[in-house]
C-alpha cells in the first residue's frame, strides 16, 4: 500500500514498559498504520525525527471488547512498532516525559 510518510506513524506509545525499553535498549514505541511495512516505518521515523534506525519490530494488537449496556462491540485491531535507534541518538518527543 502506498502511504504518505506522515500517515505511517500515528502516535508515540508512552507506557511504563515502553519507557523501560527506551532507557535500556534505545527502543521507541509507536502506533503505526495497520498496513505499514517495517521498511515504511523505518523510512518514516528517519525522515520525521532525523535519526538513524537500526531495527524495526512490529506487532499487531487485538482490539478489546467493549460494552455499552447490553450491546457488545469491539475496538479495531492496531499495529505497534518498536524502533531501535543508533547509539547516542534519541527522539526529542520522548524526552519530555
Curated annotation (Swiss-Prot):
Which cellular component terms (GO) are annotated to the entry? ribonucleoprotein complex; ribosome
User: According to the lineage, what is the superkingdom?
Assistant: Bacteria
Q: For this protein, what is any one GO molecular function term?
A: structural constituent of ribosome
**Gene3D superfamilies annotated for this entry?**
3.30.70.330
For this UniProt record, the keywords arranged alphabetically read as follows: Ribonucleoprotein, Ribosomal protein, RNA-binding, rRNA-binding
An example GO BP is:
translation
Residues of the signal sequence? none
Q: Which InterPro entries match?
A: Nucleotide-bd_a/b_plait_sf, Ribosomal_uL23-like, Ribosomal_uL23/eL15/eS24_sf, Ribosomal_uL23_CS
Q: Which Pfam families match?
A: Ribosomal_L23 (PF00276)
Record carries keyword Nucleotide-binding: no
> Cross-referenced HAMAP family, in alphabetical order?
Ribosomal_uL23_B
Role played: One of the early assembly proteins it binds 23S rRNA. One of the proteins that surrounds the polypeptide exit tunnel on the outside of the ribosome. Forms the main docking site for trigger factor binding to the ribosome.
How would you summarize the oligomeric state and partners of this protein? Part of the 50S ribosomal subunit. Contacts protein L29, and trigger factor when it is bound to the ribosome.
Q: Which family does it belong to?
A: Belongs to the universal ribosomal protein uL23 family.
The family database entries (NCBIfam families) matched by this protein are listed as: PRK05738.1-3, PRK05738.2-4, PRK05738.3-2
Listed name of the protein: Large ribosomal subunit protein uL23
Q: State the species of origin.
A: Anaeromyxobacter sp. (strain Fw109-5)
Amino acid at each position: 500500500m502506498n502511504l504518505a510518510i506522515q500517515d505511517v506513524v500515528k502516535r508515540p506509545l508512552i507506557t511504563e514498559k515502553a519507557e523501560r525499553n527506551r532507557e535500556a535498549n534505545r527502543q521507541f514505541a509507536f502506533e503505526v498504520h495497520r498496513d505499514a511495512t517495517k521498511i515504511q516505518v523505518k523510512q518514516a521515523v528517519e525522515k520525521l525525527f532525523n535519526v538513524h534506525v537500526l531495527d524495526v519490530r512490529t506487532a499487531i494488537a487485538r482490539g478489546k471488547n467493549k460494552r455499552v449496556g447490553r450491546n457488545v462491540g469491539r475496538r479495531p485491531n492496531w499495529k505497534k512498532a518498536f524502533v531501535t535507534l543508533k547509539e547516542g541518538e534519541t527522539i526529542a518527543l520522548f524526552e519530555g516525559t
